């Protein structure tokens, strides 16, 4: 069905099509029982045997423990304001990452700021953290009392906040959403907020992560919860800087890594939109992000979970990242090109790959490639 609708959507400006689709998903999310019923058709095992094959538990035996019915999640950026979480979980995602959210609402960069590269199965965006702020997100998350999957919140700083004060913006996000977020993702790697990537420098990153963790601990008295804190890194770091940043994340006590954000690289692209400024996502990142996952797994020695994201268009792509060391994987750009049915396709494909390799649970392939 999506392949019939896609040509119509692709006639629209990319951001207009995004808003139209998201509005439809928001309306579907509000239909009682519909998202949960749809989920029984999209998550392997909800209707029959072998339902444990894709199930993962991370941060076990701690206040941060979470269970995922599938290792496949929605990457941040598609549902910036948590408008359609029930619909996305109905697709079959094992978790949903919303945001990036900043303490105050902001409009982001000027349009046009989102571009398709169909021949390359890629997107370029320079959105600039456009979002409705933490208060609006809190109101939306507060009504999701019966969540089918964990909801992670990707947090950032407002554009007007200088880097020396950035930690307070991240703390404000945690303070505002700590009672509702199942995890926080510290975004210091978007290329579309001036100076943001400088916060990936090891010393600055360690200080920022500690500030976020301090806020999480301070909130435990009020919320009785301790959501894990993950850090999302860029794919464009020099290898030595990447190693230093990963080490800083570990030393500061973060709970995991997301590898990786969009890239500024333009190698091998054919579409004219390759000249647009912004972060590139999609198929061109498939191999690069998988290699970075492998590097991160080697550097961390499997001490913390890794989420692999970048160019996941098939079960084989997801499986490659798991073999490289990812515990979970995320998709975004592939949804634009393949549609929501891709989620079920990847889930079912992962089950078949496990059966082919004689593996009972997805956890047993992590880091084995």
From Swiss-Prot:
Membrane-related topology note: Peripheral membrane protein
Active site location: 190
Record InterPro entries: Aldolase_TIM, DHO_dehydrogenase, Dihydroorotate_DH_2, Dihydroorotate_DH_cat, Dihydroorotate_DH_CS
The entry's keywords: Cell membrane, Flavoprotein, FMN, Membrane, Oxidoreductase, Pyrimidine biosynthesis
GO CC aspect terms: cytoplasm; plasma membrane
Localization per record: Cell membrane
Residues that, per the record, bind FMN: 76-80, 100, 154, 187, 232, 260, 282, 311, 332-333
SUPFAM superfamilies named among the record's database cross-references: FMN-linked oxidoreductases
Pfam families according to UniProt: DHO_dh (PF01180)
Cofactor note: Binds 1 FMN per subunit.
GO molecular function: dihydroorotate dehydrogenase (quinone) activity; dihydroorotate dehydrogenase activity
Biological processes, Gene Ontology terms: 'de novo' pyrimidine nucleobase biosynthetic process; 'de novo' UMP biosynthetic process; pyrimidine ribonucleotide biosynthetic process
Cofactor(s) in the UniProt record: FMN
Domain of life: Bacteria
Pathway: Pyrimidine metabolism; UMP biosynthesis via de novo pathway; orotate from (S)-dihydroorotate (quinone route): step 1/1
Catalysed reaction equations from the record: (S)-dihydroorotate + a quinone = orotate + a quinol
Binding-site residues for substrate, renumbered to this chain: 80, 125-129, 187, 192, 261-262
Entry-linked PANTHER family: DIHYDROOROTATE DEHYDROGENASE (QUINONE), MITOCHONDRIAL (PTHR48109:SF4), DIHYDROOROTATE DEHYDROGENASE (QUINONE), MITOCHONDRIAL-RELATED (PTHR48109)
Listed name of the protein: Dihydroorotate dehydrogenase (quinone)
Native source organism of the sequence: Deinococcus radiodurans (strain ATCC 13939 / DSM 20539 / JCM 16871 / CCUG 27074 / LMG 4051 / NBRC 15346 / NCIMB 9279 / VKM B-1422 / R1)
Lineage, top ranks: Bacteria, Thermotogati, Deinococcota, Deinococci, Deinococcales
Gene: pyrD
């Amino acid at each position: 069905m999506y392949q019939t609708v896609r040509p119509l959507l692709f006639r629209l400006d990319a951001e207009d099509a995004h808003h139209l689709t998201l509005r439809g998903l928001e309306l579907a999310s509000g239909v009682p029982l519909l998202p949960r019923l749809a989920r029984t058709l999209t998550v392997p095992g909800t209707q029959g045997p072998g339902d444990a094959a894709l199930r993962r538990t991370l941060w076990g035996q701690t206040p941060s423990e979470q269970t995922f019915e599938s290792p496949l999640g929605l990457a941040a950026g598609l549902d910036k304001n948590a408008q359609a979480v029930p619909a996305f979980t109905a697709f079959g995602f094992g978790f949903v990452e919303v945001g990036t959210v900043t303490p105050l609402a902001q409009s982001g960069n000027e349009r046009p700021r989102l571009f398709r590269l169909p021949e390359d199965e890629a997107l370029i965006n320079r959105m600039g953290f456009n979002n409705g702020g933490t208060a609006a997100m809190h109101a939306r998350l507060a009504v999701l009392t019966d969540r089918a999957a964990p909801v992670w919140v990707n947090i950032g700083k407002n554009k007007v906040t200088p880097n020396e004060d950035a930690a307070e913006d991240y703390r404000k996000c945690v303070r505002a959403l700590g009672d509702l977020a199942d995890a926080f993702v510290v975004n210091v790697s978007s290329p579309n907020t001036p100076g943001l990537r400088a916060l990936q420098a090891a010393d600055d990153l360690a200080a920022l992560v500690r500030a976020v963790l301090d806020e999480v601990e301070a909130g435990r008295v009020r919320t009785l919860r301790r959501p894990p804190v993950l850090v999302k890194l860029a794919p464009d770091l020099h290898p030595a800087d990447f190693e230093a940043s990963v080490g800083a994340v570990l030393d500061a006590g973060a709970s995991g890594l997301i590898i990786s954000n969009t890239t500024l690289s333009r190698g091998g692209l054919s579409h004219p939109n390759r000249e647009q400024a912004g972060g590139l996502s999609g198929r061109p990142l498939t191999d690069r992000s998988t290699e970075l996952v492998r590097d991160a797994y080697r550097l961390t020695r499997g001490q913390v979970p890794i989420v692999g994201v970048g160019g996941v268009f098939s079960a084989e792509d997801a499986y490659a990242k798991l073999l490289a060391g990812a515990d979970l994987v995320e998709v975004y750009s592939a949804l634009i090109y393949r549609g929501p049915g891709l989620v079920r396709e990847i889930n079912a494909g992962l089950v078949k790959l496990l059966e082919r390799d004689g593996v009972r649970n997805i956890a047993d392939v992590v880091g084995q490639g």
